[in-house]
A protein has these predicted regions:
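A general structural signal for well-ordered alpha-helical segments in protein cores
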Residues: 58, 72, 150, 168-171
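Short loop segments at secondary-structure junctions
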Residues: 32, 53-55, 64, 126-131, ...
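Unchanged
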Residues: 36, 43, 47-48, 77-165
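Long hydrophobic alpha-helical segments typical of transmembrane helices together
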Residues: 161-180
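Conserved Nudix-box catalytic region and its N-terminal flanking loop in Nudix hydrolases
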Residues: 5-7, 41-43, 47-91
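A short, amphipathic edge element
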Residues: 3-14
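Hydrophobic residues on conserved beta-strands that form the core of alpha/beta folds
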Residues: 10, 24-26, 37, 61, ...
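Acidic, metal-coordinating catalytic segment for phosphate/diphosphate chemistry
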Residues: 12-50, 54
Length: 180
């Protein structure tokens, strides 16, 4: 049961930055008769796909992510305006891999930065994929498609070699559901 005395009340907000991928607002809030400010990053939500090729491998992309360097991650992308997360997942998966999932099941949603960011990640699992096109990248994307044994992916997560949060959440949620 939610207690209304535990909720911070928003009075107003001021936009202090408006960029291509994020905007930053300062919210004036009160809680227990005290006033303070909250810095909130508004960011588009995204969809991601943990996809299996039918041979125990997952499809990952390896790309350079400034400022962190090269990373392995599951295919993903931001939702367009009013875009359904499932539609976004399929679109991004085709663009980044050239494959289309015949079966796509919702896996988990999560907020990667719950205390100060509005972004929500929608994760799906794909089985029974088929090659439908070549990879279609944005002007600022460069990636390599990598097929990796799922158990190797899990070992790389545990060893700290996979550091991408959506990949970690999707893989561990899936592994737990299948008792891998």
């Amino acid at each position: 049961m939610m207690n209304s005395r535990m909720i911070q009340k928003k009075h107003n907000k001021k936009k202090v930055y408006d960029g291509k991928n994020i905007s930053v607002n300062i919210h004036n809030v009160s809680f227990r008769k005290k006033k303070f400010k909250r810095e909130i990053v508004e960011q588009k939500s995204a969809s991601a796909v943990l996809a299996f090729d039918g041979k125990g491998n997952v499809l990952l992309v390896r790309q350079h992510r400034f400022p962190h360097g090269f990373v392995f991650e599951i295919p993903a992308g931001t939702l367009g305006k009013n875009e359904n997360p499932r539609v976004c997942a399929i679109r991004e998966f085709i663009e980044e891999t050239g494959y289309k999932p015949k079966k796509l099941k919702h896996l988990i949603n999560y907020y990667p930065f719950i205390g100060y960011n509005t972004q929500k990640i929608h994760c799906y699992v794909a089985q029974d994929i088929e090659k439908v096109s070549e990879i279609k990248l944005e002007y600022d994307e460069f990636l390599t498609l990598v097929k990796m044994d799922f158990k190797k992916l899990l070992k790389m997560i545990v060893s700290g070699k996979i550091v991408d949060s959506k990949t970690i959440c999707a893989a561990l949620t899936y592994a737990n559901s299948k008792k891998v």
